[in-house]
């Protein structure tokens, strides 16, 4: 993630927000005007209205000088979806579990794509059918759950902000029939090499939401944050998500080159972190800490081929310093 931003606690929002390093920290003393950054306690990045996030970054509005061009070749294959472009902001209204095929799904640095859905449990499935990778460099916003499926690869840029109620990015494909039947099994596309998914940006989802990054190789160098939900980095050839609202995950790995790497920060406040692959490397931060007295998070690191390089910081405890579960398997 771009290092001109860092996480600070907002007393007004009661959450961590990404802010410019040129700004000062929020007030945590009893004296007015005394400000300092939070350094000792991890708090979640709660799902906020996009305006709050933009204001915290010093972006009161999005420039309208660039015509939105990152989305091309929209074809609705299930359900309904309508698209409206206003300058560099693209708004899509979709029905529950709508499926949209795209020739190109990119979000440029000055662009914003917003999915307006029927409820927080609604989902939209976006699939890229060309041979182009997806590059998300701008803002992706939704009140529901967003799936992005591109077997060619997905890169989330250092200035990107993803702010949804649930987010799944996968370089493994899923058939329309499986989506309609709510059988969320993603697997390698025939005659295609396993592609990589990389996150350099900021991904936040709503309370109890989930973030799933799925591919042949998965790498996080940015910040991922959920509140009571789950974060999964899954590298393999076949992944099944049993329930997209309250996800539990099964997976199979048949190739030793599948690798999951975390060099960034992953926060699951009282939730679950799953990193599963043939090979795992962690040099960043994995935190499932909870401010609740009774609830602790869980962290599972599962290296199917038995190779796990575990460094960085790993923490799962509640307010009473009682630990959650940390499981490392090979």
Predicted regions and their residues:
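Active-site and channel-lining beta-strand-loop segments
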Residues: 6-9
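Extracellular and secretory-pathway beta-repeat/beta-biased strand scaffolds
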Residues: 2-4, 15, 24, 28-51, ...
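IQ-motif-like calmodulin-binding regions
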Residues: 12
């Amino acid at each position: 993630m771009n290092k001109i931003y860092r996480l600070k606690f907002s007393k007004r929002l009661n959450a961590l927000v990404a802010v410019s390093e040129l700004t000062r920290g929020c007030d945590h003393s009893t004296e007015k005007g005394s400000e300092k950054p939070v350094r000792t306690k991890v708090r979640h990045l709660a799902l906020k209205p996009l305006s709050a996030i933009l204001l915290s970054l010093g972006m009161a509005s999005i420039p309208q000088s660039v015509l939105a061009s990152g989305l091309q070749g929209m074809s609705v294959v299930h359900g309904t979806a309508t698209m409206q472009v206003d300058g560099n902001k693209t708004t899509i209204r979709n029905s529950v579990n709508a499926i949209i095929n795209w020739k190109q799904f990119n979000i440029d640095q000055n662009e914003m794509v917003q999915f307006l859905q029927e409820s927080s449990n609604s989902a939209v499935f976006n699939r890229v059918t060309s041979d182009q990778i997806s590059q998300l460099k701008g803002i992706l916003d939704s009140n529901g759950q967003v799936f992005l499926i591109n077997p060619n690869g997905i890169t989330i840029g250092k200035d990107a902000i993803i702010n949804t109620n649930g987010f799944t990015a996968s370089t493994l494909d899923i058939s329309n029939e499986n989506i309609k039947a709510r059988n969320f099994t993603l697997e390698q596309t025939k005659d295609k090499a396993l592609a990589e998914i990389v996150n350099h940006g900021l991904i936040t989802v709503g309370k109890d939401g989930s973030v799933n990054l799925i591919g042949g190789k998965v790498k996080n160098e940015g910040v991922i944050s959920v509140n009571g939900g789950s974060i999964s980095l899954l590298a393999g050839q076949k992944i099944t998500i049993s329930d997209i609202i309250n996800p539990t995950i099964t997976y199979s790995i048949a190739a030793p080159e599948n690798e999951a790497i975390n060099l960034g920060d992953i926060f699951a406040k009282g939730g679950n972190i799953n990193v599963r692959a043939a090979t795992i490397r962690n040099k960043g931060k994995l935190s499932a800490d909870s401010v609740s007295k009774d609830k602790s998070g869980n962290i599972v690191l599962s290296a199917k081929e038995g190779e796990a390089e575990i460094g960085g910081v790993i923490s799962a405890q509640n307010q009473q310093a009682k630990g959650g579960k940390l499981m490392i398997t090979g």
